[in-house]
């Protein structure tokens, strides 16, 4: 059991591929909390908290989605308000996150996104723009590059890949 700091607003959580770390996106204070998970006891220990927004951003924002890259080396979070995706390197041994990039999502209010099973693509759906945007993921660095590919959709609640 772990109690988030008051006002954080935990929204979603994803385990690392090895199951040793839990990354929680906090909707209200725009942070990601990283916890160590002890499978034997079920215990969670705080390892660190990182902000998903640039330091100079002063507008309204809530974070929405969090995903761990299939390689385990990167974590992604969407910012509704800043209209961006924050990219973090994930240190495998400690689980700690280091900010790498913040990139425009290509629409308003990025609600949900998914990584392809092979980790090559990230597709982002938006709450206030009827659009799916596609990013290529650099396998070595985790950084995103917006592609010219997109699709108009009337409403986007969830993005998922199926085998």
Q: Where are the model-predicted features located?
A:
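Conserved beta-strand positions in repeat-built beta-propeller and related beta-rich domains
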Residues: 16, 24-27, 77-80, 124-127
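Surface-exposed loop/turn positions within WD40 beta-propeller blades
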Residues: 29, 72, 81-84, 129
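Short loop/turn segments immediately following beta-strands, especially the blade-tip
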Residues: 35-43, 88-95, 136-143
């Amino acid at each position: 059991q772990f109690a988030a700091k008051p006002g954080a607003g935990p929204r979603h959580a994803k385990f690392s591929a090895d199951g040793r770390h839990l990354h929680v996106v906090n909707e209200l204070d725009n942070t990601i909390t990283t916890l160590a998970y002890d499978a034997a006891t079920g215990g969670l220990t705080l390892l660190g908290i990182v902000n998903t927004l640039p330091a100079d951003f002063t507008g309204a924002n809530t974070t929405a989605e969090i995903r761990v890259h299939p390689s385990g080396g990167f974590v992604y979070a969407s910012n509704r308000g800043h209209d961006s995706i924050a990219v973090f390197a994930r240190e495998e041994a400690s689980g700690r996150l280091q900010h790498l990039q913040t990139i425009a999502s290509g629409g308003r209010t990025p609600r949900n996104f998914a990584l392809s099973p092979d980790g090559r693509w990230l597709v982002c759906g938006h709450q206030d723009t009827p659009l799916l945007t596609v990013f290529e993921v650099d396998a070595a660095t985790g950084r995103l590059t917006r592609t010219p590919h997109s699709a108009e959709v009337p409403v986007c609640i969830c993005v998922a890949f199926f085998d």
